[in-house]
Amino acid sequence: MADIHIADFYKDVARIFAQLYLSFPRKITLFVEDISGPDSPDEFGLHCTRFQSCFSTMIWLAETGYIHYESTIRQEALEQVTLSHKGFTALYWRLDLEELSGIAVDADKELPPSVQETYASSIYLVRQALKSGSSHAIEQVVQTLLRK
């Protein structure tokens, strides 16, 4: 069983990718709370560990070249965020469905080729994994994306 912080990392990456793909190529403000859920600051006003980890995931995606942003709003959001070329192509790319197990894909051979292409796209698989709620499915898809 994976450590919970790693499972949260994969879920955050998947949610960030899904949200940025929906707005591509527009730049948006990406709020940590929209990805990780509500924050519960401590008595000193410091963000909870989960919130901080999500913000760090956003920064990590930028440092590794998957997203671009112009500035931060404290540790609460990134401003003017968009997918980079690397991030966009990773999400548009077709994944080998044989590599992934545990993700429900409607890969009917009788469907038109264009629909089959959609079902094999990385972003479709990210959305399906998030929809399933399965940590294992999310981990598989994100690991495969980050290896490309």
Describe each PLM feature range:
Residues 4, 46-49, 71-78:
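Short acidic, glycine/proline-enriched loop segments that cap or flank alpha-helices
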Residues 20-24, 61, 90-94:
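Generic structural signal for hydrophobic core residues of well-folded globular domains
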Residues 59-75:
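A short, conserved structural fragment
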Residues 79-116:
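Short, amphipathic alpha-helical interaction segments positioned at domain boundaries
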